Swiss-Prot record:
Its biological purpose: NADPH oxidoreductase. Has antiviral activity against BmNPV.
Entry keyword annotation includes NADP: yes
Lineage of source species: Eukaryota, Metazoa, Ecdysozoa, Arthropoda, Hexapoda
Protein name: NADPH oxidoreductase
Organism: Bombyx mori (Silk moth)
GO MF assignments: oxidoreductase activity
Length: 10
C-alpha cells in the first residue's frame, strides 16, 4: 500500500 508501504508494497 502507498500509506503503509513499509510493511507491504502494493
Amino acid at each position: 500500500s502507498m500509506i503503509g508501504g513499509v510493511m507491504s508494497k502494493g
